[in-house]
Amino acid sequence: MNARGLSRCQRQLLEELGEQYCVNRIDGVKCIYRDFGDHDVEICGGRTIRAPFHIFVWQKKPHLEIVERFMDLPHDCKQVAVLLQQIAQRYDA
């Protein structure tokens, strides 16, 4: 799925994150997504400069469950990218 339908702010974050992240439709909304194998990460929000980002880390096995959540993150792509690097270090298989 391409970045079409994302806001300018979300596209900017997707570009900052690089090719490991993609766009995925989750619950009818386009989000930025990365699959880590047994876990995945969903980044939503950020539709405008004032709108915060929200990050959810999902455990997929043995059942689907949110294991970490980061809510109301300021719209700072570099800061969000650093947090996602830390998350990747914990969950990337």
Regions found by a protein language model. Name each.
Residues D40-W58:
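Short, conserved beta-strand/beta-arch hydrophobic-aromatic motifs that form part
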Residues L83-R90:
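C-terminal alpha-helix
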Residues M1-H39, W58-K78, R90-D92:
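Negatively charged, low-complexity tracts enriched in Asp/Glu with abundant Ser/Thr
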